[in-house]
């Protein structure tokens, strides 16, 4: 009755039961979630442990790889240092050998000096002995002279002193002559050693220049376009460049002929651009030639700057640099003048280092020694004098200016630097293969050399050898004496200098031989 009369009781019971059921369900859900969370946490921890192990392995591998790379790098550095040490060891050994050789030479010279000193001492002792003998002789002759000729003691002493002084002066003159000859031989040997060292240490590249250039054509039809209507195009090219265009049967090629390398290069580059562009007519030709000329001026300026950089010559006037660049397209007996100037600069530097003088100054003088050849066709005078004036005009030191003017004996050399430039110039120009001549002119020059020698009286035969750098003359011993042979060689050399033009120098050797033949019967 109570429950019926109070329906809220059922509702409360239902709520209590529902709450209990919800509580238990919630509790189970929470427990299940906790289990899931614990399982996930465990899984995360396990995954983290696995990832950590993997990272540890990767880090270990990476560290091993880095250690290996560092080890390889260190081994390479150690090997490089070991090689450097070996090179230094070889250099030191070479220096020790050089020092040892110099010591041996010094000891030999010292021994020669010791021998000479001993000989001098022996000679002095002999002189002392002679003095004593002379004194004794004076004492003996004093009374005899006074008795026979009435000569006083002072007069006798004067006669004897004059005799002894004359003998001593003769001995001293002989000794001085011997020492002078020994010093000349030693100086000659040292000079030859320095020149040989310079030649051995410098090995420059050399490419012979030609007087013709060939321009390839895409087809033979292009020859007609280059010639143009009634030849107006080819005439325009020749007029603008000053180069002869030769179009012959040579397939797909045009030949450019000219002795001015700058103009020939302008013509070659201009023709290549015209062929590539396809527009070939007089107006376009003049435009392209002018453009190429400006570009070539920039190229020559860059060549001059590169030359000064290679030599280490700083502060050279910009006009001199431009003139140096022009030497790139200037040749002398087939030898490129810029390459020759660089070669002379390096040879001067090597020899200057051996002699203990300023290497940079020597290189600078060698580089600029032929600067006059860049404008010798525009200015009157020899290229040495022109170069001297240009160097003075653009602020080069007085030593450089004088060395340039003296390298071809236009003015007498007065310093070691002047002689170095002359020697390096001769080495660069006279070495085999440096300069070339056409076969006809080469043979003609040899014939002219022999003809000049054969014109002199007393010359039996003459032979031009060593590519015309040495003239051997066989003199008639019945007509030429030994003294006249020396005079003959000088006269022939003077005649060659007056009548011929040639690179380098020519040695004239007169050989006089006397033969006596008899038969035993």
Curated annotation (Swiss-Prot):
Parts of the chain that traverse the membrane: 1-21
Name of the protein in its database record: Ribonuclease Y
Protein task: Endoribonuclease that initiates mRNA decay.
Main localization of the protein described in the UniProt heading: membrane
UniProt KW keywords: Cell membrane, Endonuclease, Hydrolase, Membrane, Nuclease, RNA-binding, Transmembrane, Transmembrane helix
Domain KH positions: 211-271
Species of the source: Desulfotalea psychrophila (strain LSv54 / DSM 12343)
Subcellular location: Cell membrane
InterPro entries per record: HD/PDEase_dom (IPR003607), HD_domain (IPR006674), HDIG_dom (IPR006675), KH_dom (IPR004087), KH_dom_type_1 (IPR004088), KH_dom_type_1_sf (IPR036612), Ribonuclease_Y (IPR017705), RNase_Y_N (IPR022711)
BP terms from Gene Ontology: mRNA catabolic process
Gene encoding the protein: rny
GO terms for MF: RNA binding; RNA endonuclease activity
GO CC, one annotated term: plasma membrane
Keyword Thylakoid applies: no
Its EC number(s): 3.1.-.-
